[in-house]
Amino acid sequence: MLSGEKVSLRPFEENDIENTVKWLNDIEHGVLIDRVLPTTIHERKEWFYNISKDKTASSFAIVLTENTSHIGNCGLINIDCRSRRGQIWIYLHDQYIGQGLGKEAITLILKYAFHYLNLNRIYLYVVSTNLSAITFYERCGFKNEGTFRQHVFLKNKYEDAIWFGILKEDFDLLEKI
């Protein structure tokens, strides 16, 4: 388990699937992520079994440190040990957004990526209309690295994707502040 002051990250478990399906099927927020909605428990179980065998991915449940309540999920995908990079993802249940918990979870997973996996670069993309996510990742130290035009199809139209990245050296400087 990776522990912080307010949140901890533990390996994603099968009993986390039911909460995950509810969160992913929330139309209000689900349209901001690049996936087909709705999803089913069966589909999420299949995802869980596949990702648990995938050597290029790590998935975590985000839990409150004080009582271990499951409040979200995060992870790394497309881990490339040769080039020492990976793609990060995160989502929190609505009631926990805006409390600094997501930032703490991102910090924990970046520590894991840079200090345990010895990766050098972590990246992600955000739909250009998701302004709160853009602000969030910038506050976490990610840098805007460019735009892929019409990269994602959402709500019956194409949206641009903004790519963000953070290097180990940048993260190490942020930790000293």
State where each predicted segment sits:
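Conserved catalytic-core motifs of GNAT/GCN5-like acyltransferases
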Residues: 12, 123-126, 143-159
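Short glycine/proline-centered loop/turn elements that form peptide/ligand docking sites
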Residues: 102, 106, 129-133, 150-155
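Terminal substrate-recognition subdomain of acyl/acetyltransferases
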Residues: 157-177
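Acetyl-CoA-dependent GNAT
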Residues: 39-97, 167-171
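A short, well-structured alpha-helix characteristic of acyl/acetyltransferase catalytic modules
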Residues: 1-46, 170-177
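Conserved acetyl-CoA-binding loop-helix of GNAT-fold acetyltransferases
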Residues: 92, 98-112, 134-139
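Conserved active-site tyrosine of GNAT-family acetyltransferases
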Residues: 137, 142, 164
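Glycine-rich acetyl-CoA-binding "A-motif" of GNAT/NAT acetyltransferases
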Residues: 68-72, 132, 158
